[in-house]
Amino acid sequence: MGRSPCCEKAHTNKGAWTKEEDERLIAYIKAHGEGCWRSLPKAAGLLRCGKSCRLRWINYLRPDLKRGNFTEDEDELIIKLHSLLGNKWSLIAGRLPGRTDNEIKNYWNTHIRRKLLSRGIDPTTHRIMNEPSTQKVTTISFAAGNEDIKDQKISIKAEFEQIKDDEIISKPIKEQCPDLNLELKISPPYQQHSDRALQQSTTGSGGASTICFTCSLGLKNNKGCSCSRNRSMNVAGYDFLGLKTNGLDYRTLETRTK
């Protein structure tokens, strides 16, 4: 449900107010005050609605209303207030005693707006029209930074690879398993070990051989020397299958020389 009308529009006058109607409205308000605008027209003997009576009184019949044209000071004040408040005419009228909001709005559209345009000022924004933009547009690009980072990464990687290659060249390669025998032979591993030990003892290279007391005195090839016996025993012991002498007795499992 909407708001009920203030009066019956079928029995109200419309259009311009007559001088007689203005005098009745002024006389009633002076005698009784403004009061309720809904009941005022009937009490004052006016065939008008309450809204029409209120607007006629506020905008035209009030005794404190200023008559005549706007002054230059009022024009500058209206321009300043409009730049701060915009089109809020009722607030602007509150700062101008004796002037109504409707009067100020009409005066703005007919006079002040044209005055601002003649000065080259936009009436809406209150700025100079066709003013070059003073704002500097700064663009931030990350492309150069990314390229510099890529170049740094490539240079660091190249330096690291160069250092790694220099370390590989300068450092000798160490065998992880120096005692590992990779020779391919059919003979048993014990015989290979005995051959290597015999070769080291005969050539003198390799590990230190055991010297008896007679040899330590400088009497080599003496009967009391036990080094020759040890060597012959080692040689004979290494040839336990008779592969060197090619003489193997399967009955006694003893080797003999031809």
Swiss-Prot record:
- Taking the record's annotation, the residue ranges forming a coiled coil are none
Q: Name one Pfam family in it.
A: Myb_DNA-binding
Q: Give the DNA-binding residues.
A: 37-61, 89-112
UniProt main location, coarse = nucleus
Quote the InterPro entries the UniProt record gives: Homeodomain-like_sf (IPR009057), Myb_dom (IPR017930), Myb_TF_plants (IPR015495), SANT/Myb (IPR001005)
| SMART domains documented for this protein | SANT
Q: Which GO terms describe its molecular function?
A: transcription cis-regulatory region binding
Keywords in alphabetical order, please.
DNA-binding, Nucleus, Repeat, Repressor, Transcription, Transcription regulation
Q: Where in the cell is it found?
A: Nucleus
Which CDD domains does UniProt cross-reference here?
SANT (cd00167)
* Gene Ontology biological process terms in this record: green leaf volatile biosynthetic process; negative regulation of DNA-templated transcription
Biological role: Negative regulators of floral scent production by repressing the expression of C4H1 and C4H2, components of the floral volatile benzenoid/phenylpropanoid (FVBP) biosynthetic pathway.
- Name of the molecule in the record: MYB-like transcription factor 4
User: Gene behind this chain?
Assistant: MYB4
